[in-house]
Amino acid sequence: MWFSPTPSLFGENTVRHGGGGWVASLERTLGETPGIELGIAFELADSRFKAVENGVTYYPIDANIRRTQKIKRKLGLVSECDALLARAERVIDDFKPDLIHVFGSESCFGLLSERSDVPLMIHMQGSLPAYANARFPPGYSRFDFLRACGGNPLSLYRMISNDRAFLRRARGEENALRTCRHFMGRTEWDRAIAAIYSPTASYDYCAEALRPDFFDESRVWTPPGGERISLVSTLSNPLYKGADLILKTARLLRHEIGRELDWQVFGIDKARLQEAKTGVQAGDCGVAFKGVAEGTTIRDALLAADVYVHPSYIDNSPNSLCEAQVLGLPVVATNVGGVASLVRDGQDGFLVPANDPFMMAQRITQLKDDPERARGMGRSARELARDRHAPDRIRADLAAIYLKHAKDTA
């Protein structure tokens, strides 16, 4: 029984995001594995209790309760998880699973281990306590958000309530981590998080499933040539995703090193606060925020680029980076969280310190100016990533993990 942050392949509700779709990719990978009957529960406003599609039982959980209750949840007067967990218990009673697989320790569903006797495994994604520690880049604070609201009371309310909700969810995740007895992950960083909060719990390795758009054997990166440096990044909105580092690095590349630059940033369509704080306008140094895009659009942009750049201040195992590796693209990434478990520094790409635009700019320039080295790094990254994310391997690993822990039911 999966408890997912997205509807996965249910109906037409597959999440569209610059680097998303990983739950749907795993569902495709698992396919019709013998001996596995799959149920998937997720938050979605839908009148049906359950629906069966292609042999999978989907449970859309509609937790959008009365407006007064929603306001209380926003203000922190009632738990945002209570209504969701009550509905989740009903799903468990109906499906009667041998094992519960929760995607993400930050989910309310991780607290089901306190409400059910069914073995529960948390599939580590990010980790909000760690993200809370790094959520403001150097030089940023809550006051920057206050100023960005421009005196708009509604914007101010949303900012404050969202920040409080983030911190509440981080505390809730700590409770889920402490009570969980089984974890699954893929980096030394998420293994460490699990061990800190639940030192006696089991931990199993399973790589992340990637979108099939990136596994086309005929699509292999080669250095594009030319003088202009072409870069691609995929981000989301939080400040800790590093849009400010992109702007600072782009300024150095364009105005200090003197290189022509084309840096496509997918997943966000603006970074006004970061532009104001850094004093760097994206358009003045070749940065274009492209917004959310389809996987094929990002894939084609990667194949035409010189380097994939990942600038986060904290991360676990960004699928966007792995997708670039599968295509054979060299990467430059900040050495944070679980990234060092994905990139062998100097072999598949380069790792640089967080918030170091100088080293990032230099590594990008090195790869551009040495296409044979870039080609070798890309080839190494492709071999590593295609083995790591091979669907058959993931399917076998996941089935073995399920069999191992479902036996605990007795």
Q: Where are the regions that the model predicts?
A:
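N-terminal subdomain of nucleotide-sugar transferases
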Residues: 1-47, 251
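Conserved donor-binding/catalytic core segment of Leloir-type glycosyltransferases
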Residues: 222-241, 247-251, 264
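Glycosyltransferase donor-sugar binding loop
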Residues: 234, 247, 259-275, 291
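Nucleotide-activated donor-binding/catalytic signature segment of Leloir-type glycosyltransferases, i.e.
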Residues: 274-299
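Aromatic "clamp/platform" in nucleotide-sugar-dependent glycosyltransferases that forms part
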Residues: 313
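Short hydrophobic beta-strand element within catalytic cores of glycosyltransferases
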Residues: 330-333
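Conserved acidic donor-binding segment of nucleotide-sugar-dependent glycosyltransferases
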Residues: 345-346, 350-357, 366-371
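A short, well-ordered alpha-helix in the C-terminal region of glycosyltransferases
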Residues: 359, 366, 373-387, 394-400
